[in-house]
Design a protein with these regions (language model features):
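Conserved cytosolic headpiece of P-type ATPases
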Residues: 1-568, 573-576, 589, 626, ...
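A C-terminal functional module that forms or caps the active site or interfaces directly
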Residues: 640
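Alpha-helical transmembrane segments of multi-pass integral membrane proteins
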Residues: 516, 582-598, 631, 667
């Protein structure tokens, strides 16, 4: 909206002139963009913040418990070595060593899935950020729309026609009222209107494997396609041309006429300019007086519908005329108007609705005119009630923008700093923002956003460098698909954490419980030949298998239904919330009880006085407790496949990796119990178990599955009762 200004980096393609340099370096528009880039710090993703907070909490808790455990053991009479080993065992049991690697693999799989849907993620954590996005700030042209101008309405001979079909494919119908018509059977003026757009034109339609594209100006391409839809495909020889120049607002061409004694001048341009050159118009095949007011009203109506409007006119001249000059363009006959627009992508309409169901607000930020932006917003159901222009934004302070930014969904005629300001104020409102952009001037906003999205086809290298994600097809619908994948990634991360932490907690509770009972039960007291229920090396093995064979398959869980029906999660929501602690407590307690019961049941006979090999009995009891803890892990795995849904609602074969992981874990456990001691390699200090011991071990392992299933049912019912009445 600035006049008489040439920006740094502008190329002059025509004419001559003089200018006064009013800014250099950082004071130019390009310089301002560079300054914005320098001033913009890339923010930490929500997941990274949560993991960092959670890690601090976990480390503090584990160290505190380990120190308390050590002091308690010393006070209870344990020697320093036993106290230290017990504390180390507890710390090893509590810390999920494999969790960082699993989180990385989960994010990597999410990135791979997004790449298959035309979204390239540059930073792994950004894959999850998409899942908690609350606002998507998107460009219009090429992202929401096809970036293919299409003629949608024609006015000719006092009649209005609708033209179907979008894009550059020459397929569509002409509709008048409620009837489909053949343009060739209407008055001459409709065909002549289409022919003028076709002849007064330098664009061409190119077909490649049934895919159509335009070679030339998109506006001229739209006129070629509308003519081709009416069956016009042949050109008469062009003799001369007055090219389009913005200042004159028209283009004229001279062609050989159909008759031997005439040539034809075709003119297209802005309705106002073309009407000034006309003296009459063609209606029903007859020359009649020019109805300027009616034509102006129709042009205004089209413009109000976000159509770019061009007027068409022609004039017959003598056969001897072979050149065309501006003065030849007086006394034209007006033919009609063609109104065209860059239509929305078909899939975007559905994608915007998905965003609404998912609780994500779509905000259009465009450099186009307010009326055009408003019309596209109306078509896409984005919300066109309030349109804020760049000029209005410039007059607002940041605090004023902050007050209204959540109520405006369309920003038009914006400059780079406006996009940047809108992004910052939306973030200030507590939103997680995804911003799209393709130009150098979009880079500051892309960098400032929680996730910057650059266009892969039309985007500049600067915008791609500043972005976290690149759309390979420049399509808004791909963003929505990536959001769904982002939510899927976070769901699987939650599943992994809610599986790993409770199982680690169960081992810790088993060690701590045994330590507290040691003064009262010889089986747990090293001073009387007793041992802890599981050894540190066994805990390390459980944690290793837990991470590789059991927790890792959870990241391959298929998407649950209705991911995009849920509202975005609260960016401030912590991983360790009340639900988390409840589940950790339940699983830890059940697992510790199962291990304790088996160890006590099979270990206490070692102190009966009639046992020949006391050490073997305790080793077998430890092996049984060790194996029971592993069995509880396997049983919990099958219910941990969903945090909220019952395991009975989906097929056990929908994730084959869970079955493979469980089978591999069981196979390795059998090898540790029976094979290694037999061949004399026994780093895990296990002993072969009698076959009949397996029945009690399995029986105490199964309850975890049903207890968690019951917990899910109660939680779901409780949430339904807490749902607000509307």
């Amino acid at each position: 909206d600035q006049h008489g200004i040439a920006f740094s980096g502008t190329f002059i393609t025509q004419g001559t002139g003089q200018g006064v340099v009013i800014a250099t370096g950082e004071h130019t528009e390009i310089g301002k963009i560079a300054e914005l880039m320098k001033a913009t710090q890339k923010i930490t993703t929500p997941l990274m913040k949560k993991i960092a907070d959670f890690t601090r909490l976990l480390v503090i808790a584990v160290l505190t418990i380990a120190v308390i455990n050590f002091l308690l053991a010393v006070l209870l009479g344990f020697d320093l070595e036993s106290s230290f080993l017990a504390s180390v065992s507890l710390a090893v049991a509590a810390i999920p060593e494999g969790l960082p690697a699993i989180l990385t693999v989960t994010l990597a799989l999410g990135v791979t899935a997004m790449a298959r849907k035309n979204a390239l993620i540059k930073r792994l954590p950004a894959a999850e950020t998409l899942g908690c996005t609350t606002v998507i700030c998107t460009d219009k042209t090429g992202t929401l729309t096809k970036n293919q101008m299409t003629v949608a309405r024609i006015y000719s001979g006092g009649k209005e026609y609708q033209v179907s079909g979008v894009g550059y494919a020459p397929a569509g119908e002409f509709v008048s009222g409620n009837n489909t018509i053949n343009p060739g059977e209407e008055g001459d003026e409709l065909i002549e209107t289409l022919k003028t757009g076709y002849m007064c034109n330098n664009a061409s339609l190119v077909e490649n494997n049934r895919e159509y594209s335009i070679l030339g100006d998109p506006t001229e391409g739209a006129l070629v396609v509308s003519a081709r839809k009416a069956g016009i495909s042949s050109h008469s020889t062009k003799l001369d041309e007055i090219p389009f120049v913005a200042e004159q607002q028209y283009m004229g061409t001279l062609h050989e006429g159909a008759g031997e004694n005439e040539h034809v001048i075709y003119v297209k341009g802005s309705p106002e300019r073309v009407l000034k050159m006309c003296q009459d118009q063609l209606v029903n095949g007859n020359i009649v007086s020019l109805r300027s007011e009616e034509i102006h009203a129709e042009a205004d109506s089209m413009a109000g519908g976000a159509l770019r409007v061009l007027g068409m006119a022609y004039k017959l001249v003598p056969h001897a005329q072979n050149t065309l000059k501006p003065e030849d363009l007086d006394g034209l006959t007006f033919l009609g108007l063609q109104g065209m627009m860059d239509p929305p992508r078909e899939e975007v309409i559905g994608a915007v609705q998905k965003c609404k169901h998912a609780g994500i607000r779509v905000v259009m930020i465009t450099g186009d005119h307010a009326q055009t932006a408003k019309a596209i917003a109306r078509l896409l159901d984005i919300g066109e009630d309030t349109v804020l222009t760049g000029e209005e934004l410039s007059r607002m302070s940041d605090d004023e923008l902050y007050e209204i930014v959540d109520t405006v969904s369309v920003f038009a005629r914006v400059a780079p700093e406006h996009k940047f300001r809108v992004t910052k104020q939306l973030q200030r409102r507590g939103n997680i923002i995804a911003v799209t952009g393709d130009g150098v001037n979009d880079a500051p906003a892309l960098k400032a956003a929680d996730i910057g999205i650059a266009m892969g086809i039309t985007g500049t290298e600067v915008s791609k460098e500043a972005a976290d994600m690149i759309l390979t097809d420049d399509n808004f619908a791909s963003i929505v698909s990536a959001v769904e994948e982002g939510r899927h990634v976070f769901e699987n991360i939650r599943k992994v954490i809610l599986y790993t932490l409770p199982t680690n907690g169960g081992q810790s509770l088993l060690i701590l419980g045994a330590l507290l009972l040691a003064p009262f039960i010889y089986l747990f007291n090293p001073q009387y030949g007793g041992r802890l229920p599981i050894e540190p090396v066994q805990i390390l093995w459980i944690n290793l298998i837990d991470a590789v064979a059991l927790a890792l398959p959870l990241i391959k869980e298929p998407k649950e239904k209705g991911l995009l029906e849920r509202p975005p999660r609260d960016p401030g929501e912590k991983i360790a919330d009340s639900t988390f602690f409840k589940k950790v407590g339940i699983v830890s307690l059940v697992m510790a009880l199962a291990g304790f019961i088996i160890y006590y049941y099979y270990g206490m006979p070692a102190f009966s006085g009639s046992v020949v090999d006391k050490d073997l009995i305790i080793t077998q009891a430890q092996t049984a407790a060790f194996t029971t803890v592993m069995l509880v892990h396997i049983c919990y795995l099958f219910t941990a496949r969903s945090i909220t849904e019952s395991a009975f609602r989906f097929s056990p074969f929908s994730n084959k990796w869970v079955l493979i992981g469980a089978a591999a874990t069981l196979g390795l456990q059998l090898a540790i119990i029976y094979a290694l001691p037999t061949i004399g390699i026994n780093p895990f200090r296990t002993a072969p178990l009698p076959a009949e011991w397996w029945i009690p071990m399995i029986l105490v392992s199964l309850p975890i599955f049903f207890i968690i299933e019951f917990e899910k049912l109660l939680t779901k019912r409780w949430r339904k009762t807490k749902r607000p009445i509307t």
